Amino acid sequence: MRELTKRQNEIFEYIKQTVHAKGYPPSVREIGEAVGLASSSTVHGHLSRLEEKGYIRRDPTKPRAIEIVTEQLGEPINMEETIHVPVIGKVTAGIPITAVENVEEYFPLPEHFTSTHNSDIFILNVVGNSMIEAGILDGDKVIVRSQTIAENGDIIVAMTEENEATVKRFFKEKAHYRLQPENSSMDPIYLDQVTVLGKVVGLFREM
């Protein structure tokens, strides 16, 4: 295989480390941040050189689709299968949660992170500290299984009256529904009606 420049080697090593640690490759932005390149076009250029030299393969139709062809000793990397899960940026009343209008991007998750079919799963970026006592922190990505019903005590994603998605613990009580924060400094939300968008089944945190 053709020799790499210093910068190409830095990028290749970072891709390998990320694949080994997470099971999927980094994004162009993450590569740029790791090696000190502000321009995404410059990163794309280096990735093209790595591909030309036979170190990686890319699929232009998929995000983060970088496959390592070989390691230095010629051993193939055991790269875990991933699925591309929609990341929901907003919630629009009257249309499915994973409709194109709601999707900000697609995020690759190792297949073992989900126990159901890809079409039943979406990701929501957590904003705020209302669930910190359940271990769900600001900036986390919660993995959500689409469903319209919930049992008492489930952590769910619900639609508020302002058509925003909120993560809370669900309780159906005698005269109302209670959406309970997992933060002792915050009050519960009481609603006559609640729209359940899904149940939180996992969490992903980027360090």
Swiss-Prot record:
Keyword terms, alphabetized: Autocatalytic cleavage, DNA damage, DNA repair, DNA replication, DNA-binding, Hydrolase, Repressor, SOS response, Transcription, Transcription regulation
UniProt signal peptide: none
GO biological process, one term: proteolysis
Protein name as it appears in the record: LexA repressor
Known function: Represses a number of genes involved in the response to DNA damage (SOS response), including recA and lexA. In the presence of single-stranded DNA, RecA interacts with LexA causing an autocatalytic cleavage which disrupts the DNA-binding part of LexA, leading to derepression of the SOS regulon and eventually DNA repair.
Record-annotated DNA-binding residue ranges: 28-48
EC numbers on record: 3.4.21.88
A Gene Ontology molecular function term of the record: serine-type endopeptidase activity
SUPFAM superfamilies cross-referenced by the UniProt entry: LexA/Signal peptidase, Winged helix' DNA-binding domain
Record text on subunit structure and interactions: Homodimer.
Chain positions of site Cleavage: 93-94
Active site residues per record: 130 (for autocatalytic cleavage activity), 168 (for autocatalytic cleavage activity)
PANTHER family the UniProt entry points to: LEXA REPRESSOR, LEXA REPRESSOR-RELATED
Reactions catalysed: Hydrolysis of Ala-|-Gly bond in repressor LexA
Family: Belongs to the peptidase S24 family.
